[in-house]
From Swiss-Prot:
Keywords: Activator, Nucleus, Transcription, Transcription regulation. PANTHER family: MEDIATOR OF RNA POLYMERASE II TRANSCRIPTION SUBUNIT 20 (PTHR12465:SF0), UBIQUITIN SPECIFIC PROTEASE HOMOLOG 49 (PTHR12465). This is Mediator of RNA polymerase II transcription subunit 20. It is found in: Nucleus. One of its GO terms (biological process) is regulation of transcription by RNA polymerase II. Component of the Mediator complex, which is composed of MED1, MED4, MED6, MED7, MED8, MED9, MED10, MED11, MED12, MED13, MED13L, MED14, MED15, MED16, MED17, MED18, MED19, MED20, MED21, MED22, MED23, MED24, MED25, MED26, MED27, MED29, MED30, MED31, CCNC, CDK8 and CDC2L6/CDK11. The MED12, MED13, CCNC and CDK8 subunits form a distinct module termed the CDK8 module. Mediator containing the CDK8 module is less active than Mediator lacking this module in supporting transcriptional activation. Pfam families: Med20 (PF08612). Component of the Mediator complex, a coactivator involved in the regulated transcription of nearly all RNA polymerase II-dependent genes. Mediator functions as a bridge to convey information from gene-specific regulatory proteins to the basal RNA polymerase II transcription machinery. Mediator is recruited to promoters by direct interactions with regulatory proteins and serves as a scaffold for the assembly of a functional preinitiation complex with RNA polymerase II and the general transcription factors. Belongs to the Mediator complex subunit 20 family. GO terms for cellular component: mediator complex. GO terms for molecular function: transcription coactivator activity.
Amino acid sequence: MGVTCVSQIPVAEGKSVQQTVELLTRKLEMLGAEKQGTFCVDCETYHTAASTLGSQGQTGKLMYVMHNSEYPLSCFALFENGPCLIADTNFDVLMVKLKGFFQSAKASKIETRGTRYQYCDFLVKVGTVTMGPSARGISVEVEYGPCVVASDCWSLLLEFLQSFLGSHTPGAPAVFGNRHDAVYGPADTMVQYMELFNKIRKQQQVPVAGIR
């Protein structure tokens, strides 16, 4: 894999989530991007079981268990303000056995799914973010394949993002700053998705200026 930028795109004014996704994919196809199947990233939140908390008033920690269709044999466990553990797919079974320590938060599952596009050295994924039956937002992931160091290719990623996102082009992800000259890996992408999902969970239903 290369270096990836994950961002949330606002819903276009007067349009639905699905209509905005169609606008974005149409722009990609006009650039010459070709469809390359589908993708899905999901996330379920677990919190520390009450029985494991010592003193009264002590707050529990959160853990996010995530899957990415690009890595079908792996499961990612991201601890709140902590490391990312990459395990095999049986990790979900282990979480059931650890229910005395971590409990699944009610109605916490959130996911994004959509279409993959290939454009030259860029892999683009435009997804609809859902919680339960409701569409909550739009995710865009862009990967630049030939490079594995974020600082070496951010300018190229930015230029490509601007070509179809315009004024909604995101800034450099926080994870880039933390790993300026380090080799980029799958865990860095999952951290970006975790941050995007948490942002969408917290968002209030207020109007925003979207894509035109």
